[in-house]
Design a protein with these regions (language model features):
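Conserved alpha/beta enzyme-core scaffold
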Residues: 1-131
């Protein structure tokens, strides 16, 4: 069986500009700081991710390395809010349950998930609607 544990260098060799990356980061407490710092060192940019302002993934946002976020909230990251309102950062908000299901589907190799959450509200705007 192939090991799921890799070195910092192996992990960084698999990360490139423009990728969508999911980080487990709760208030900066569980961030992959070695990987995030390595991404800053390598100059990786245009990442899709979130976090707090000066911790974890937030360091990538602060350095303008993130082009868009798929998140449940950005309330703890004033830099992300400022970039969003300045048109520098695209943000897709997703309800927590839908967010978790999207993660599950991605991990299972599925193309996506269908949910009625947000139909008939502002959340529906710009989204594909299947009937």
């Amino acid at each position: 069986m192939k090991s799921k544990v890799v070195t910092r260098e192996e992990a960084l060799s698999r990360i490139h500009d423009g990728q969508t990356i999911m980080f487990g980061d709760w208030h900066g407490e569980f961030a992959a700081d070695e990987i995030i710092d390595g991404m800053l060192e390598k100059g990786i940019k245009d990442i899709v991710s979130a976090g707090m302002a000066d911790q974890g993934v937030g360091k990538l946002i602060k350095d303008h390395r993130v082009k868009s976020l798929i998140t449940t909230h950005i309330g703890l990251n004033p830099i992300a809010k400022d970039q969003m309102f300045a048109g520098e950062l695209a943000i897709e908000f997703s309800p927590q349950g839908t967010f978790a299901e999207r993660i599950r589907c991605g991990g299972a190799g599925l193309g996506g998930c269908l949910t009625p959450t947000g139909l008939g509200t502002e959340v529906e705007e710009g989204k594909q609607k299947l009937t």
